[in-house]
Amino acid sequence: TPENTNRVVCECGWCQRYAHLLERVDTMLDERGGTEVFQIRPSSLELLAGQDRLECMHLTSGGARRWYAGCCRSPIANTLAKPGPPFVGVLACCVDWTQVAKEEALGPVRVRVNGVVPPADRTRLRARRRDQFSMLGHYAPKFFGWWLRGEGKQIPFFDAAGQPIAEPERIRTEPVR
């Protein structure tokens, strides 16, 4: 639900590089090169099948772990390197829905980050500094509540010992500029 979701668009060069590596630029990036991600409570995500096809890459030494289906190179989600903080960012392009259903399920995009947005477009694209603070005000209480309840240990991409269920591959590359 929109109350438990944080919907953002990231325009960083690493998200763009990831789309290129998966050969999914057309489906992963919007017209400005942004990747839409919705951040959710890790324990609310369940992988029903295909765990044996999961692959993981990371583009920087301490950066996000980027999970995808190795069989079709479909992006699934981003996590931190280790479980603990309750963070999973699901890539919106991996879900089959209509725009109406997406808006109902996730609410509006709360903020667009890591891009250069012309001042005239910042309000429309939700790329103002106040949008960042608003997003943090919405998400931070949930994040810390989930953390206090230990929900960061229930991330489906890690086993009970906290090890990734697929060995992360370090891809040495540069961000898209």
Question: Model-found features: residue ranges?
Answer:
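A short Gly-Trp-Pro
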Residues: 1-177
